[in-house]
Amino acid sequence: MQVFYSVRSERMLIEQLQYNLLFQWFVGMEMDEAVWNHAVFSKNRERLLNEEIAESFFQRVLGRAKPHMSDEHFTVDGTLIEAWASQKSFGRKDGKGNPPGAGGEVDFHGEKRKNQTHESTTDPDARLFKKSTGSEAKLGYLGHVLMENRNGLLLQTFLTEANGRAERDAAMLMAETIPGGKRVTLSGDKNYDTQEVVQELRGMNITPPVAQNNTKRRSAVDEPTTRHAGFEVSQRKRKRVEQSFRWMKMVGMLRK
């Protein structure tokens, strides 16, 4: 319900459950039934994640949507999911560094922070990462999706550590799940234009119409692929994955 009706927080959802008849009907509550405390969500979240309830729900949705999915043309992409950790929590692993000032805040001015020497005290698994040149480095993870190109439906999603190889490694893992038996295409942005990715995909009988990266080097995508009429179609279709990312972050509450 939070996602469908853009309810910004669990506390707000509980508040609306007290008077919203539609919400009460959705969860099977009687009109005069007491609403639970918002802390119940926090207590149950770990249990639901451990039991893979969300994954089970996702697979059932995929089963219903299967008639509308392409089995030939796909797209992979990744996006930065911010961690619930502030930049000020990203300190040296050895405990050294500038001492806290007034208010307990640490002054990082002039200090070069790297994942090799620093980590977040509140989320040690988060990594300082920037998705593209010129963008701000943030503490977070990388989210990865596999999309079919006919209607822009997502077939797979998962989260990894944020690092320079994560998107390409995730693409290979998702490519392995695409059913064989026919020749398929897997498009992506310039980040996937490497000899390693292109060769591995071709070894799986997958054509890689990924965007070419010609900056200071030669693209790994050959001319027969780029000249094919389907290349331009794949490039147009792959941009639909950005719509999924925008929805996930603006509506689906997955910005962090």
PLM ranges: what are they?
Residues 1-7:
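Alpha-helical support elements that line or immediately flank enzyme active sites
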Residues 8-17:
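Short, charged amphipathic recognition helices of the HTH superfamily
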